[in-house]
Amino acid sequence: MSYINLPTVLPISPSKTRGQIQVILGPMFSGKSTELMRRVRRFQIAQYKCLVIKYAKDTRYSNSFSTHDRNTMDALPACMLKDVAQEALGVAVIGIDEGQFFPDIVDFCETMANTGKTVIV
């Protein structure tokens, strides 16, 4: 399922836009949110426009996401990623904290990567 209408591009086309999906895996308290924050900050330092999305029902830190050592970063709350698709189209890098809670994570990440975005989950 696509949230936007994209022109059809043949796989062999040299003008095909290429994005990427980076997945951060690990058990609880292993530093996944810290690594997400580190990667997004590196892109910000390189002058890329970034957006971080957090699960809206996680209300521990208001409109930011936080690591266990209390470092915070502004984040857009959402329950469904399709609800923030328009905001995501306006940036180059999309960070998604607690991706396992979003039922549309796979479709969203694939759609955004196919538009040339870097998606970090």
Curated annotation (Swiss-Prot):
N-acetylserine carried by residues: 2
Keyword Kinase: yes
One Pfam assignment: TK
EC numbers for this chain: 2.7.1.21
Main location: cytoplasm
Note: Two forms have been identified in animal cells, one in cytosol and one in mitochondria. Activity of the cytosolic enzyme is high in proliferating cells and peaks during the S-phase of the cell cycle; it is very low in resting cells.
Comment, domains: KEN box sequence located in the C-terminal region is required for its mitotic degradation by the APC/C-FZR1 ubiquitin ligase and interaction capability with FZR1.
UniProt family annotation: Belongs to the thymidine kinase family.
Protein name: Thymidine kinase, cytosolic
